Amino acid sequence: MLDKNIAKGGQAVYQEPVRRASVNFCKRHDVALDIGANVGLWTRDLCQFFQQVHAIEPVADFRECLRKNVPARNLQVYDCALGAENSMIDMIITPDNTGHSHVDPNTVGQGGIQMKTLDSMGLPAADYIKLDCEGYEYKIIVGAELYIKSCRPVIVVEQKFHKDTGIVDNGEAVDLLQSWGMRLLQKKNHDLIMGW
């Protein structure tokens, strides 16, 4: 599960162009959130660009790898999932591709992992948010309305068909952000860079 190239200080090139492009849209580089941090591919770069990085990852094994991959002093890791409500959930882990692990929608209210709204977390105002949660992006944004409207960050949202979850992302997450006044700054593959 631990990417040997990352652990040895190698370059993590997966999605690097979107990371670099999106960070350039930020006016400030104080605080970044990595929502769906997984094992830290994005987190590692964000720790180089921002003074504080808050990584949210609900899967314990992934958090362990994240901490090994990104031993940065400016990183805080949170052991919860995000969603539209404060509740409990379970995750479905996909063994062939850890990046496709996702919330089991049938367990909301009864699982073993805490789910919080971003609005309820009390995090400092973010300049940047990366949001890659395998089809759960819309629900996370619903639970982050006050936070997003307050700090007005650049947001990178993954938008694609998620074959493992069966969720077809029909653009609801981006539509909601646009209804709040955000606009599309750039599209790179399945990632949309949103700003104000």
How should these model regions be labeled?
Residues 1-196:
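Phosphate/nucleotide-binding beta-alpha loop and adjacent structural elements of enzyme active sites
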